[in-house]
Swiss-Prot record:
Protein's name according to its UniProt entry: ATP synthase subunit a
Organism expressing this protein natively: Streptococcus pneumoniae (strain ATCC BAA-255 / R6)
Annotated transmembrane regions: 15-35, 76-96, 111-131, 167-187, 208-230
Keywords of the record: Antibiotic resistance, ATP synthesis, Cell membrane, CF(0), Hydrogen ion transport, Ion transport, Membrane, Transmembrane, Transmembrane helix, Transport
Lipid bilayer topology: Multi-pass membrane protein
Amino acid sequence: MEESINPIISIGPVIFNLTMLAMTLLIVGVIFVFIYWASRNMTLKPKGKQNVLEYVYDFVIGFTEPNIGSRYMKDYSLFFLCLFLFMVIANNLGLMTKLQTIDGTNWWSSPTANLQYDLTLSFLVILLTHIESVRRRGFKKSIKSFMSPVFVIPMNILEEFTNFLSLALRIFGNIFAGEVMTSLLLLLSHQAIYWYPVAFGANLAWTAFSVFISCIQAYVFTLLTSVYLGNKINIEEE
């Protein structure tokens, strides 16, 4: 299987992956258009496109509210809705098509099939939980809950690191494996014409399975984000 490379651009010491940037902007655009389209001319009795939006919204609220609590849920409901939609689209983009030039430059893929991208997403989630902890409870109380008693500090640091790493590796492993398998099945169809029906059927079945797994991973990522955030902002006052 030929190795593909993503186009990059450097601005000083900073290197930007153009494929990842393009895919991210595309995802944000799709989410914006979907929410704008589905929320236009809303009525008290939902119908059609409004039903779709409300179903997705209720679904996301249903599995995140137990972790955040009703007290704070209204402040984070849109965040979790957008996060879930972002992860669903990001995980499935690479299954839709391939856009690669003759020299191996890749212009289309799931951004979550890139480990650096997933590590960045995971880091932002962990950073968000700490920022919200400080904003909700104050810097002093947040630090105290993290460092008291003193002997648990190493365990707290290890917990934060494992949360960060597991969140990234889980999504990367599943999405990357799905794209690799899809590429292998596509290559199989190029070996001989009699392999084409087999490769087509196998790829169709694998794509359906990958879409299911991708949606499950989006659910898990959003769920764990709500768990981590809830643990930071719902600590009982002493």
